[in-house]
Amino acid sequence: MFPIHKKLLFAFLILFSSFINAQDYSVYGKITDQNGEVLEAVTVIIPILKIGSTTNALGHFNLKDIPKGTWEMEIRLLGFKKIKIKIDKEKNLDLVLESISEALNGVVITGTMKELSRADSPIPIEVYTPKFFRANPTPSLFEGLQNINGVRPQINCNVCNTGDIHINGLEGPYTMVLIDGMPLVSGLSTVYGLNGIPQSLIERVEVVKGPASTLYGSEAVGGLINIITKRAQNSPSFSTDIFGTGWGELNIDLATKFSLGKKIQSLLGVNYFNYQTPIDNNNDNFTDLTLQNRISVFNKWDFQREGYKLFSVAGRYIYEDRWGGEMDWTKEKRGSTEIYGESIYTKRWELFGTYQLPMDEKFIFQFSANGHHQNSYYGDMLYDANQNISFAQLTWFKTLENHELLLGTSYRHTFYDDNTPATADAKNIDLNRPINTSLPGIFFLDEYTLNNQNKLLLGMRYDYNSTHGNIFTPRVNYKWNSIDKQNTLRLSVGNGYRVANIFTEDHAALTGAREVVFINKIKPETSWNGNLNYVKKLFIGDTYLGLDSSAFYTYFNNKIIPDYETDPNKIIYNNLEGFAVSKGVSLNIDLIFPNGLKLLAGVTAMDVYSVENNIRERQLFTEKLTATWNLGYTFKNLGINIDYTGNLYSPMRLPLLSDLDPRTEFSPWWSIQNLQITKRFGNEMEVYFGGKNLLNWTPDKGNPFIIARSEDPFDKNVTFDNNGQALATPDNPYGLTFDPTYVFGPNQGFRMFLGFRYQIL
């Protein structure tokens, strides 16, 4: 017989054992791809229990509170093969997902304003992740886009290195840039606003080539770039990316996250770029690269709400001080005629957010506001401008059988003021008249799934511009895919509409080297566009081959083409009395070998021209053929990656000042090539180094000079005739005036770089 206290202890142990056995358990671990790269935003779920989680930036997940028993767990990520696992107790798992195609990974939101698989989108959208941009590290997103097929960052000035983004041959003002779907980088900020976006906070970049005016308004005529930022919950606790170059450039990216309570998370990022070493390798007494001192601060807040409804607010502030010019220029000479310099001070703030209304129907309210102040001198010419843009949009998503409907309304207000005649009173130039433009609009989208292979997207947008009146932008998209989804065909037709602001879009109008002349009142541009896209996926044994081909055609009326050639002392602006065309074909190839070798390459052939008075003229600064490549190899056992990236451009037509101008009328074939080696130390640290512009190519190759009359930037020693034309003299044998706009590529030659990345979960 057991004593009474032993009986009680025995009973307690039985109850405790039963209690322990009935406890919930957890499953946790890490998920990577076939090359050992961690995968974030992977869904890990037990469907029958409706318990789920997602991986963070380091690929880790933790599924808690799983009831005792045997369950089937699913692991899935768009672009990878789904796997299923039986679980019955606490486990630490290391899982590997097999990629279907790196080119098809992830979700897209740009085409229809809702998240869906890129393969299911009726609109062709290209997606680029941070891994793509890390293959060729750059201090700004503007430079990072250079290895995307059909996208070319164009430098517009040899002195201040301002630039814009060309898509399929169309100039920067035709490209709309969004941050989290908000139109933040536009108007005045298209010149310098793409700098200072912390790349450590970018989740992905979505690119649409061709008009997207139905959803995003009149600026999205040539294409659209949507920068999607990370959410705090998918980011490491701390990360940094620091690199420098042999030219003395230093770029620092810092990011951290923190929480306020259980339902508020914040992501904070800082980007700092500094370059303060004047270099003149082409011996023209002008800086080859603009000196810059820039800081950008980004902060995003995510709020957890009941029913997982969206609520996020973000802001960004940028300050930049940049200058370029004669090598002995100092700030004391800013705005003087003693020494030529271009000095630009930029202050910019942005605020934007998304809020899902607390109701059963899906209503999403989005808002943004930004202010941009640019105080600049181009030689002795002052350009002082302020721009404030506010934007609000309400969208309603509704599903009716096979119809995914989207109804939205938006309002945009733009305030613009500067010290140029653009904001002067028409009758009294001394009277200031800031420009206030209101743009209310409404748009409708119907994504109609005909069957498993056919989908139709119909869209219509109506805007009312307070200056130019009614704007209609319809669009039709059709998508077909084979039963096995290895073949996809997309067709789109629609139109675009754009109101131009010369002084915010064309840097050449500000340099002071030429007089700006308007022949008539500038009318809005209109365009019609067609795009045919075909995607083919092939699996050859363990090798994957993806083909993505497109044909595009855009027809313009009232196109605004700056005339540099009629008078070398003027830029003449007028609407084209004929028409303009941008047409071409492109091909992207994604090749993945099982041994770790990957190739992403593309080529675009295009013809961009205008016709006026039956005279066909090729567009300036536009290549007929461009190619890009990204070749990478991973030594898995060593933790080493090698990336060889580059681009190739065919000759472009360039503006000459006179028949005597000795510079070449067409650029040569030219290429920028880069090599990088990355060594990984665990999942926390990477060290990378390499060389940029391996061929040491610069535009002065084959030219006697790039900047005309760099020795006389204020034209003090130029003799003019009665018509204002420069005369050839012994001191000026070619009859030229100062002009820094003969530019088609970077003046920065070969340089080494070294950097490291570090992150803490």
Predicted regions and their residues:
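Short, acidic, small-residue-rich periplasmic hinge/interaction motif at the N-terminus
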Residues: 32-34, 42-47, 74-80, 90-134, ...
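Short acidic/polar hinge/loop motifs at secondary-structure boundaries
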Residues: 62-65, 166, 182-209, 297, ...
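N-terminal periplasmic accessory domains that precede
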Residues: 92-96, 141-144, 161-166, 178, ...
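Extracytoplasmic beta-strand/coil segments of soluble accessory domains associated
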Residues: 142-183, 203
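Flexible loop and strand-edge segments within Gram-negative outer membrane beta-barrel domains
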Residues: 275-296, 302-363, 369-389
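Membrane-embedded beta-barrel scaffold of Gram-negative outer-membrane proteins
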Residues: 364-376, 481-483, 490, 523-576, ...
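C-terminal beta-signal and adjacent terminal beta-strands/loops
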Residues: 599, 648-656, 679-761
